[in-house]
UniProtKB/Swiss-Prot annotation:
Pathway: Amino-acid biosynthesis; L-tryptophan biosynthesis; L-tryptophan from chorismate: step 5/5. It comes from Rhizorhabdus wittichii (strain DSM 6014 / CCUG 31198 / JCM 15750 / NBRC 105917 / EY 4224 / RW1) (Sphingomonas wittichii). The gene is trpA. HAMAP family: Trp_synth_alpha. Its EC number is 4.2.1.20. Pfam families: Trp_syntA. Keywords: Amino-acid biosynthesis, Aromatic amino acid biosynthesis, Lyase, Tryptophan biosynthesis. This is Tryptophan synthase alpha chain.
Length: 271
């Protein structure tokens, strides 16, 4: 069983949603990433998403765009990201780590090279934002061959006709982008999230994680009542932008409030 499968099985057995946290790799500098990632784990994150900084992050809102600029300004490269991942894996052998980003840095040296290096670094999954599943004839197969999960995105516009294409070859979990827009936007209504999660769960055995627009414990708790995972990114990235190299403490404390919220949701479901 993979680390992702084991983690979602464990959180399911505990009756709660997994906490999936996102930070941009290399923000504020590559050297600051170790303490920040450790803080996420210490705060109760179950899965870590590490964003690959890119010059044109079209799916990201202002917070993550600024994080990309900070990371690139610090000279962060794909090699740095892989080194950060490998060091994280040594410190945290059982915590799943997912790389998330855009196609250009993933395929620049060839998808097979990227997939092999990601696997070597201990990466469990990859989310590529801008390769539609219908056009994923190279990266997805390379990831699967290397034992890395290609994690797919579904959106509010993913209808019954397109959903099979999204799920074809997907593994790890299904990431539901709950708003049709950029990261950090206002969260979608709870009723629409619940309906979407139910629809996806009826179509796949993969865990369904919900993200985009989840900014605090109350939202996380509400989504945690219905989803298998809750993804929080922009709110954490904002803390890093505010505190810089001293962000580890605030990140740990905020992550702990999110983790506690998901445990409250589990208690409410069990009551």
């Amino acid at each position: 069983m993979t680390r992702l499968a084991e983690t979602f099985a464990r959180t399911r057995a505990e009756g709660r949603a997994a906490l999936v946290t996102f930070v941009t790799g290399g923000d504020p500098t590559p050297g600051d990433m170790g303490p920040i990632l450790d803080a996420l784990v210490a705060g109760g994150a179950d899965v870590i998403e590490l964003g690959m900084p890119f010059t044109d992050p079209m799916a990201d809102g202002p917070a993550i765009q600024r994080a990309n600029l900070r990371a690139l300004g610090a000279g962060t490269t794909t090699a740095d990201l892989l080194a950060i991942a490998a060091a994280f894996r040594q410190r945290h052998p059982s915590v799943p780590l997912v790389l998330m980003g855009y196609a250009n840095p993933m395929v620049r040296r060839g998808p097979e090279w990227f997939a092999a290096e990601a696997a070597k670094a201990g990466v469990d999954g990859v989310i590529c934002v801008d390769i539609p599943p219908e056009q994923d004839g190279a990266l997805g197969p390379a990831l699967r061959a290397a034992g890395v999960a290609p994690i797919r995105l579904a959106t509010p516009t993913t209808d019954a006709a397109r959903l099979p294409a999204v799920l074809e070859g997907a593994s790890g979990f299904l990431y539901y982008v709950s708003v049709a827009g950029i990261t950090g936007m206002q969260q979608a209504g709870q009723a629409s999230i619940e309906a979407a999660v139910a629809r996806f769960k009826a179509a796949t055995d993969l865990p369904v994680a919900v993200g985009f627009g989840v900014r605090g414990p109350e939202q996380a708790e509400a989504i945690g009542r219905v989803a298998d995972g809750v993804v929080v990114g922009s709110a954490i990235v904002d803390l890093i932008g505010e505190h810089g190299a001293a962000a580890a403490g605030p990140v740990r404390d905020f992550t702990a409030t999110l983790s506690a919220a998901l445990r409250r949701a589990a208690q409410e479901k069990a009551a």
